[in-house]
Amino acid sequence: MAGVKEYKCPSCGGVLEFDSTLQKMKCPYCGTELEVEALEAYDAHLNDETPDDMTWDNVQGSDWEEEETAGLRTYICESCGGEIMTDESTAASNCPFCGNPVVMMNQFSGQLKPDYVIPFKLDKEAAKEAYRKHLKGKILLPKSFHDENHIDEIKGVYVPFWLFGAHADASFRYNGTKKAVWDDGNYIYTRTSYYSIFRKGELRFEHVPVDGSTKMADDLMESIEPFDFSEAVDFRTAYLSGYFADRFDISQDDSINRANARIRQSISDTFRGTVHGYQTLEEQDGNVRLTDRNASYALYPVWLLNTTWHDKNFTFAMNAQTGRLVGDLPTDNKKMILFMVGLSLIFMAIIFLFFYLRA
């Protein structure tokens, strides 16, 4: 004998029962009522859901030509393990990541050759000016940091990025609520209505970036985005002249999870932005299927600025294409306390005036 199928309440997860009086499905736990037809449509949607398919093919890439590597040099940092490459006319004495001395290797040993490069658009002076502007208006910044601070080192570095592209078919399900409140003079009533909201659609993603270097903090690199890929060109070693290129030490395979997370979050945010009119909205589940997948390897331009204050190192990064600069700054604890006290006094004054005027 076939088993009896149970239907879950979309609001609380309890088992729905058929109410013969209402001729509806009703949850005995939260009181949610559903038309049988609506429940069948809801169940059909759930049955259509499939697991995520977000796999990728490996980048084939291209090998270096002998004449391309002849003029390249590789430097190794003995402290952080950073490995950079540049042309033979550009000398490196310090690591752009940690500032410690680097050792030159006479022979370049090639990895996968980059497919694309976005050339440096802004020069070193633009990076210095962006840094000075970054310090302005920071009321909690210690005065000594502003007065005594100077840039220890500034270097232009091409950061390796894996770029992912795909066509996405996705569907997401949300639980939403709407509340109505009224009174009859004696009691205040609240009616909460529960809804299941479905969204389904297709999106195209191109050149989703994931940095391929362990020396570059992920949040730092994501903070200086976006890069404009329309200005990317086919890679040529000539673009390395005067700059350094970090060599990737995170493979494409190891970058896939971050790429998938960024794609999935972007889809979720896009779908969620189409749902309006609910007091609460909670994502329940979703699935994403990727097709027409591709990946490539590119170098993006970044200015790295290193400075030292009170024996602590501070690193700032600037997008050398757009000029966006980010980096953490120290906080003056005394200024912070005074700032919080000031806010508290203002808040208390507003409350006092509110009750005083009402009285």
Give the positions of each predicted feature.
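Juxtamembrane boundary at the C-terminal end of a transmembrane helix
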Residues: A349-A359
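Short Cys/His-rich micro-motifs in 6-15 aa windows
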Residues: G31-A38, G99-N106
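Extended, hydrophilic extramembrane loops/domains of integral membrane proteins
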Residues: Y300-V326
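Residues immediately within or flanking Cys/His clusters that coordinate Zn2+
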Residues: V4-E6, K24, L72-T74, A92
